[in-house]
Amino acid sequence: MANKPSAEELKKNLSEMQFYVTQNHGTEPPFTGRLLHNKRDGVYHCLICDAPLFHSETKYDSGCGWPSFYEPVSEESIRYIKDLSHGMQRIEIRCGNCDAHLGHVFPDGPQPTGERYCVNSASLRFTDGENGEEING
């Protein structure tokens, strides 16, 4: 794992929601994330370490209330952890570089993968492919 900033540094630089989601495995309320309806072309990066995670071409509207993707940029970009919390069996997804919590992956997505990477906006930074503008979730 890459060196990541200390908890103190992160608390200083992140919103409460961003810290809660990325560091405490939290979940933002559905339909509230800043990047949920973003339709611009570009790349979604980890908010903590800026590692690329998802291309906009793989984003789709799953109706679940969080940004959804059917495929990460690479196998190494995502770390998968069995999550048995809240009486459920799920697969947690974390940044493969810095271990920040991103969300969960489910086997109910579209082809070609059949997977739905359900990601908290608060864990992402979007970089616009045309003008380079960055938007923190």
Curated annotation (Swiss-Prot):
Cofactor annotation: Zn(2+)
Catalytic function, reaction form: L-methionyl-[protein] + [thioredoxin]-disulfide + H2O = L-methionyl-(R)-S-oxide-[protein] + [thioredoxin]-dithiol
A GO cellular component annotation in the UniProt record: cytoplasm
Alphabetized Gene3D superfamilies for the sequence: Peptide methionine sulfoxide reductase
BP term (GO), one: protein repair
Binding site for Zn(2+): C46, C49, C95, C98
UniProt entry keywords in alphabetical sequence: Metal-binding, Oxidoreductase, Zinc
MF terms in GO: peptide-methionine (R)-S-oxide reductase activity; zinc ion binding
PROSITE patterns given in the database record: MSRB (PS51790)
Family that this chain belongs to: Belongs to the MsrB Met sulfoxide reductase family.
Protein name according to UniProt: Peptide methionine sulfoxide reductase MsrB
